Amino acid sequence: FKFLDEIGPVNTNTMVLDKALGYKTVEDMLTISGNYFNLLKYGWGTSILYDEEIIKDKNELYHSYNIRTYTGGTLFELANKQNKIDEYFNEIDRLGFNAVEISDGSTTIDSDRRAQLINKSKELGFYTLSEIGKKNPQKDSEYTTQQRIDLINTDIEAGSDMVIIEGRESGKNIGIYDDKGNVKKDDLTSIYENTPKEKVLWEAPQKNQQVELILTLSNDVNLGNINSNEIVSLETLRRGLRGDTLGKL
């Protein structure tokens, strides 16, 4: 059916969430969808619970598809809170991670410290992502759209390769989403128009959010927190191979 694929592969960034996938599951997933994403986040603090050989083997497998891997922000925040940042960087390097997420979703990091850690991550050779937003919806709602814009641009100036807009796994009542998971269009537009689009990644766990971001911004919009069994689904949305985007791109 290749002759029906008018758009073809989309050059973009897609981040997938690994919540506890076994090695064989990852093998099968990559066989089917390994060409459709390039960032893999081990969810929350799950990496602490795995045998380290499993982590090393999975990282090697992901890397064979040119997919960057990282632990997500929770372990970074724990390390920073416990003054164990050097140990953290050494450990992720030892286990084969090649990317880092700098965040303060559950803790507080002042702007100077944040910039310093972004710079440190870059100096150590890691692909560096940073995240804007709080895990607690009430605290997250205290950010104005302009503050989010300023934080994004500040992180990019500090050296962040990609800035993630917090959306959590639920995609509700957080960031650019209301309590029903609908996109707040004015916020979306303001952020998009005042930041480098190629360096902003929107967490969009729900299909309706993926559709709206693709149709509103473009099919190469950077998207994250994609469920591992919905990678191909997202790719069809990007290519206009599903009813939601068919004939609309």
Mark where each language-model region is:
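Active-site mouth loops of central-metabolism enzymes
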Residues: P9-K24, G43-S47, Y70-K84, I132-Q147
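Catalytic cores of alpha/beta
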Residues: T31, K84-N90, Q146-E157, P205-N219
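C-terminal alpha-helical cap/extension of soluble enzyme domains
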Residues: D187-L249
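Active-site-proximal loop/turn and secondary-structure-junction residues that shape catalytic pockets
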Residues: K19-L21, W44-I48, G73-E77, D104-T108, ...
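Conserved N-terminal beta1-alpha1 strand-loop-helix module at the mouth
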Residues: F1-N59
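Hydrophobic faces of well-ordered beta-strands that scaffold small-molecule active sites
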Residues: N11-D18, F37-Y42, T69-G73, V100-I102, ...
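Active-site-adjacent beta->alpha loops and helix N-cap segments on the catalytic face
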Residues: K24, I48-L61, L78-E87, D104-Y127, ...
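Conserved anion-binding
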Residues: A99-N173
